Curated annotation (Swiss-Prot):
Keywords: ATP-binding, Cell shape, Cell wall biogenesis/degradation, Cytoplasm, Ligase, Magnesium, Manganese, Metal-binding, Nucleotide-binding, Peptidoglycan synthesis. This is D-alanine--D-alanine ligase B. Its cofactor is Mg(2+); Mn(2+). Pathway: Cell wall biogenesis; peptidoglycan biosynthesis. It comes from Mesorhizobium japonicum (strain LMG 29417 / CECT 9101 / MAFF 303099).
Amino acid sequence: MKSKHVAVLLGGFSSERPVSLSSGKACADALENEGYQVTRVDVGRDVGSVLAELKPDVAFNALHGPFGEDGTIQGILEYLGIPYTHSGVLASALAMNKEQAKKIVKTVGVPVAESKVANRFAIQNKHPMKPPYVIKPVNEGSSFGVVIVSEGQSHPPQVVGSSEWKYGDTVMVERYIHGRELTCAVMGDVALGVCEIIPTGHSFYDYDSKYVAGGSKHECPAKVSPNIYQKIQTLALKAHQAVGCRGVSRSDFRYDDRHSENGEVVWLEVNTQPGMTPTSLVPEIAAHAGHSFGELLSWMVEDASCLR
């Protein structure tokens, strides 16, 4: 029996609550199987006082979205002096802001797509760049609010400026990159491997592709040339280190090989709180690298810390 008491933080109150509940349950169950004493904490506004009373040895952060992966919960854990998994305050905040993260990784030679930040109301009547392009909320995950504007589309999508839009007023407009969706997991200072995501019946890796059964297929390891495979691993590790991530992260890429095998590789974003069910991408990539789900989570618990 392992002696550590682990508080698994799950749920929360962001739009990604259902995803977090799924990740948190899987992690809590697996950690119990590994011999840890586990308490499941469905996070509310009183989480600070709950954790202060609970006094766990480690907090396993299974939250997703604002509050859970933007540096907020990380700051609370730092204040309480509770070691926690995944990235720290600054790296979490930077990674959650897609535009700022892109600026940082670009300085270390990671290729990114042309983009600009705009107010959503300012792009209602005129294209902010020549289509095709993608509109993304600056601070959301799980592909919430992502809109693809196709080549030849005469007007910007009206939903972005409407009352239906629930993802903040600031959006990132990014050049659309044709090609295959690839992702690479990083564990500590090692890139674990590259997986291809093949959406089923979807134009890109949206919410349903990620979380609805049969929404996508995963090709692990990705069937690309050894040079491209190594390049993506190198870029993912560079992004992880440049943003200041710790523990586990996952970088997403587009790979356009329509005209040559070497093609164009473009980094899209780094996820500091990737999905953590046994069938999620990071555990799947880790399994191909020889790490079981339980072993991966145990490593994360032992890697947990404050102030780094």
